[in-house]
Amino acid sequence: MIQVESTLQVADNSGAKKVACIKVLGGSKRRYATVGDIIVVSVKEAIPHSKVKKGEVLQAVIVRTKKEVRRMDGSYIKFDSNAAVLLSKQGEPVGTRIFGPVARELRARNFMKIISLAPEVL
């Protein structure tokens, strides 16, 4: 469960290390986001000479959350960290590699590019 002011790790090689959620997309009163949801983020930490700079505002899709997500078969999945992948204006990932596992829920949300780049889909 990600809300405004939550900090997330970045799970791609765009150059950002940490981002903070500044808006949950999908309705004016929407408070929380989970795996597969798109949020607006601000870059809080970035490595030098990277594709993104500190202070940039971008969209991101959540790929891992500490809060468990219930699946249709009744099972739950949760991760050790909150992580997101940065997206361009066109909805494509900014980075060319994805680090760490991602949740299978992204497949239902049509993030096939992220699924194909990920080393493991849980």
Curated annotation (Swiss-Prot):
Q: Which GO terms describe its cellular component?
A: cytosolic large ribosomal subunit
Q: Which family does it belong to?
A: Belongs to the universal ribosomal protein uL14 family.
- Which keywords does the record carry? Ribonucleoprotein, Ribosomal protein, RNA-binding, rRNA-binding
Q: What is the lineage of its organism?
A: Bacteria, Pseudomonadati, Thermodesulfobacteriota, Desulfovibrionia, Desulfovibrionales
Residue pairs linked by disulfide bridges in the UniProt entry:
none
Name the SUPFAM superfamilies on file. Ribosomal protein L14
**Self-association and partners:** Part of the 50S ribosomal subunit. Forms a cluster with proteins L3 and L19. In the 70S ribosome, L14 and L19 interact and together make contacts with the 16S rRNA in bridges B5 and B8.
What is the top-level taxon of the source organism? Bacteria
Extract the InterPro entries matched here: Ribosomal_uL14, Ribosomal_uL14_bac-type, Ribosomal_uL14_CS, Ribosomal_uL14_sf
Protein name per its UniProtKB record: Large ribosomal subunit protein uL14
Q: What does this protein do?
A: Binds to 23S rRNA. Forms part of two intersubunit bridges in the 70S ribosome.
Q: Which PANTHER family match?
A: 50S/60S RIBOSOMAL PROTEIN L14/L23, LARGE RIBOSOMAL SUBUNIT PROTEIN UL14M
Which organism encodes this protein? Lawsonia intracellularis (strain PHE/MN1-00)
User: Which GO terms label this protein's molecular function in UniProt?
Assistant: large ribosomal subunit rRNA binding; structural constituent of ribosome
Which Gene3D superfamilies is this protein grouped with? Ribosomal protein L14
Query: Can you supply a Gene Ontology BP term from the record?
Result: translation
